Amino acid sequence: GAFGAVMEQLRKVDAPRLIERRLAGGRPVLGICVGMQVMFERSDEHGTAEEGLGQWPGTVSRLRADVVPHMGWSLVRPPSGSVLFDGVADERFYFVHSYAATQDPAELLGPGPTRLPQVTWATHGHDFIAAVENGSLSATQFHPEKSGDAGAQLLRNWLTTL
């Protein structure tokens, strides 16, 4: 999906407010693919600055790779202590995307009282964010539902947070 079109549809059904209320109540939210991208502050998809939900600082930009879109299986590099990747830290997951966030939101936030996001990385032309875990908000750039046994385990891991 396109970032701007997704944000437009989310706004039509007041989803930004609903997501914010859910997170404020500590209830888990999982974003997948463009669902992860819209959690960032903005996207420059198609050369137009689009505002996202702003849950994390940073911009979603076009991948800098010889082959775009990135379609296929890639190894991910989760941080130690990851809940989502428990038992699947050395697995490949299925990606299909042309845009991604590349700046660690924890670095953009800097030190302070907020709980810093844990970032999982992957590489396609350059490093990009493959997943983020941040309290009750989790998101993946890849499709766990298309990622076989590893994706099923990741979803089971997320379900333990409910």
Regions found by a protein language model. Give the residues of each.
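Amide-donor transfer/coupling interface in amidating biosynthetic enzymes
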Residues: 24, 58-162
